[in-house]
Amino acid sequence: MLHIINRSPQSNNALENCLNTAAGGDILLIEDAVYAATAGNAIEGTLRAAMGRFKISVLRPDLEARGLADRLIEGVSPVDYGGFVDLTANNKTCQSWL
């Protein structure tokens, strides 16, 4: 399953809810959720711990638009829009967390 999250972990608990509820799969962080994939943020440890159960990707254009490309956590895969399409096509179901 592909889990899509678009809210910053500082303003919304969608990512934490996903990590606490879902059994595994792919996570794609888009829009303001890309802040969760940066070194030094409050949820960095939680995200790193989840890497055993989830493959975590971040939408590179959103990361770059926020000037955060150089702060990406090791183990998180940046993807372009084509990669977003591939993740969607490779998963039978997609869940957007609000």
Positions of predicted regions on the chain:
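Short, glycine-rich nucleotide/cofactor-binding loops
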Residues: M1-A14, E31-A39
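Structural motif
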Residues: L2, D26, T93-C94
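Histidine-anchored nucleotide/phosphate-binding helix
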Residues: Q10-G24
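Structural motif corresponding to alpha-helix initiation and N-cap regions
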Residues: N12, G40-E44, P78-Y81
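Short, conserved loop/helix-junction motifs that constitute active-site signature segments
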Residues: L19-A23, T46-R53
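Short internal beta-strands
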Residues: G25-E31, F54-D62
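N-terminal beta-loop-helix "entrance" segment that forms/cooperates
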Residues: A33-A49, L68
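C-terminal structural segments of small proteins and small subunits
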Residues: R66-L98
